[in-house]
Amino acid sequence: MKIYEVTFNWNGENEVHSFWENAQSSVEKFIENMTRRGDLVFVSKRLVKEI
């Protein structure tokens, strides 16, 4: 399992989400789902810890 910090930009403000990646959920899918509506813009992802 990997823990990521994913940063999005919303109305000029950065917003950081923690995301736990496992076999059922990938960080790329999470980013795709979060940005689908168009008001969040993906900024960066950072691997915090691998368990």
Language-model segments: which ranges?
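Short aromatic-glycine-(Arg/Gly/Cys) micro-motifs in beta-strand/loop hairpins
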Residues: 1-15
